[in-house]
From Swiss-Prot:
Name the UniProt record assigns to this protein: Tetrahydromethanopterin S-methyltransferase subunit A 1
Residue runs in coiled coils: none
Source organism of the structure: Methanothermobacter thermautotrophicus (strain ATCC 29096 / DSM 1053 / JCM 10044 / NBRC 100330 / Delta H)
UniProt xrefs under Pfam families: MtrA
The encoding gene: mtrA1
Cofactor binding note: Binds 1 5-hydroxybenzimidazolylcobamide group.
UniProt-recorded Gene Ontology molecular function terms: cobalt ion binding; tetrahydromethanopterin S-methyltransferase activity
Record text on subunit structure and interactions: The complex is composed of 8 subunits; MtrA, MtrB, MtrC, MtrD, MtrE, MtrF, MtrG and MtrH.
One GO CC term on file: plasma membrane
NCBIfam families the record matches: mtrA (TIGR01111), PRK00964.1-4 (NF002126)
Annotated family: Belongs to the MtrA family.
Record field: transmembrane: 219-237
């Protein structure tokens, strides 16, 4: 038997639109934009529910996951959230973390991928405790249930550290039973293009500075060569 630990008192610690199963299960599932949370729980998941926003929604999810050290797998399934691109944002957060100053998820393509309520130690705990299983855009119940059972069979036991409890502000977004309207794909595309333009402007500036230095060096070399040639010519004439 693998080792199990007690979740934080009152787990799940953050309210939300989810279904709770066996708290000793090693599997959690986010169904992203789809309301098929009963499917993973029926197969043995500890908790399952949608996650519609790439900021507060992810923060709430992380708070509930790291407060239960028994959960070692996070299955991303259901339809991707248009505009928010929440599933990809979760993967990017797990792989890359956040910018320490701006708090944006590094590599996320969603419209507003910022993590402000989870400290660095909470993000590191999420990265170490959980393995991400990508079934994004998969809504087939049999496929999801099979993956849940596969993860249960690979249960490595509870994470070595005790439950970590982080308070997340719950006002405004994704309250229980509330639908969060997705950002229009056009808006998300504009946001992404603006970020790309900013990056390209910085690259162009660096390139211009480099070429300016090279040009300055070439001009200096030409002037030295010209002076040397003139001096040599005068000496030969004399």
């Amino acid at each position: 038997m693998v080792e199990k630990k007690s979740p934080a008192e009152g787990w799940p610690v953050v309210n939300g639109d989810y279904i709770v199963g066996d708290p000793e299960s090693p599997v959690a599932a986010t169904t992203l934009a789809s309301h098929i949370e009963d499917v993973p729980v029926e197969a043995g998941a500890a908790i399952a529910g949608p996650c519609k926003t790439e900021n507060l929604g992810i923060e709430k999810m992380i708070a509930n996951l790291i407060s239960n050290p028994n959960i070692r797998f996070l299955i991303l399934c259901g339809s991707e959230v248009q505009g928010h691109i929440t599933g990809q944002s979760i993967e990017a957060l797990h792989q890359n973390g956040v910018d320490p100053d701006k708090r944006n998820i590094i590599g996320a393509t969603g419209a507003i991928p910022y993590i402000e309520n989870i400290p660095d130690e909470g993000i590191e705990r999420f990265q170490k405790q959980l393995e991400i299983v990508n079934l994004i855009d998969v809504e087939d119940a049999d496929a999801i249930k099979a993956k849940v059972k596969e993860c249960i069979e690979k249960d490595p036991g509870a994470f070595e550290e005790e439950a970590m409890v982080i308070k997340v502000e719950e006002g405004g977004e994704e309250e229980e039973g509330e639908e969060v309207k997705p950002v229009a794909p056009e808006t998300a595309l504009i946001e992404a293009r603006m970020r790309n333009i900013q990056t390209q402007v910085k690259m162009i500036g660096s390139t211009n500075r480099m070429f300016a230095g090279m040009y300055s060096g070439k001009v200096q070399g030409i002037m030295i060569g010209l002076a040397f040639t003139l001096t040599l010519g005068i000496l030969l004439l004399v």
